[in-house]
Amino acid sequence: MENNTELILISISGLDRPGLTACITETLSHYDVDILDIGQADIHSTLSLGILFKSKESNSGNVMKDLLFQASELGINLRFYPIKPEEYQAWVNMQGKNRYILTLLGRKLNAQQIAGATKILANQELNIDGIRRLTGRVPLDERKSSVRACIEFSVRGTPKNKEELQSELMQMGIQLGVDFSFQQDNMFRRMRRLICFDMDSTLIETEVIDELAIRAGVGDQVKEITLRAMRGEIDFKESFKERVALLKGLDVSVMREIAENLPITEGVERLMFVLKRYGYKIAILSGGFTYFGNYLKEKFGIDYVYANQLEIEDGKLTGRYTGEIVDGKRKAELLQLIAQVENVDIAQTIAVGDGANDLPMLSVAGLGIAFHAKPKVVANAQQSINTIGLDGVLYFLGFKDSYLEERGIL
C-alpha cells in the first residue's frame, strides 16, 4: 500500500430512511476515496452500515470532519476505526477459506436456540460473516399455526471436527426443538435441479400398505411383519413380500378410494408449486406402490415415479408384485440414474425421506434431508426437518418468503 494513504472503517447506526447511504457516499466522493468493502443491514427500521475505504493521508482529517458534520445533520451515529495495512491484508487472505451456511428453522426461534447453535460454531472456530432472516416478519399472535421462523448464518472457516459439529448440531436440534441445515456455500447449493421424495410418511401422512391391510382385514399381521423388519429380524424385501401376500383378494376399488383420500403432508402444495415454478425436476422414489405414486404425479405434476407395482387380475390384488422391489439400495441407484438422464451433477440433487430405507439416497444426494424421521434416520442424516411442514425444504435451498410474495406464491 502507498505510504501516503490510510485505511479507515466507518460504522454508522441510527433510524433508517431513504437517502442515508447516498448522503454518506456522496461526502466520500468529494475526496476520491476507494471503497474497499461495504455492508448494510436494517433491523426494525434501525440502520447498521459499515464502509471500509482508502484515503490519501492528507485528506483523512477533512474526510472525517465532513462525515461527522454530515452525521450530525442526519441525526445518526458515526464512529471511525483506523485499520492497519497488515490487518487488512490478513482479512484479504481469508477470502479463500471454506464458507458454509447454517440454517435454523422452526415454528419460532428463541435466544436459547440461537445461542446453542452459535456456541457450537464458536467452539469449532468458525466465524459468522452475516445473518439474515428468510421468513417473513413474525406476528405476535402465536396461535397462527402457519407461522414459520428461519434464520440463515453465513459462516467462514474450517471446522475442527466436522462430524463432531454435525453431531452437536443434531443433539442441539433435538433438545431445543429446532431444525437445522449445515451446508457448504458453493455454486451447487444455489443450483439444485433434481429433488427426490419418499412417498409414505413424507409426501403423505400415512403408510399406504397399512391402509390397504386394514381394508383387507389383516392390519395386525402386517404391523407385526413391519415390527420384525424394524427389529432387523427380516430385511425389507422379505417383509415386503410377506405383507403384499396378505393383500390377496383386495378389490382395486379400495385402492382408488384410498388414493382419493390420501392425507397430504403440510406444506406439500406450496413446495411443489415453487419447485415447478423454478424448473426443478421432481421424482418419487418409494418402497410403496406405483398406483398411489401416479395419483400424486397427476395431482402435482411430478416428473418421475418409481415404486412397486402390485399385480392385479380380474380387478383384484393377487398378493404378488411385478418388477424389481424398490428398496433403499434401489432408491439410491434411481436417484443417480435420473440425475444422469437429466444431465444433473449429483451435487445438484436433493433427497427427502423419513425411513431407514431412505438413508442410502439421503447419503448419495448433494443435500439429504430427514423429514419427521425415525431417530435412526435423524442420527445419520446431515439435515433434518421435524418442526414444520415439507415446505421447510425451501429455506434449506435459500428461498426467502419475500421472493415468493413477489410472485404471488404465499
Regions from the PLM with identified roles:
Residues A22, E26, K65, F69, ...:
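Solvent-exposed alpha-helical segments within well-ordered globular domains of core cellular machineries
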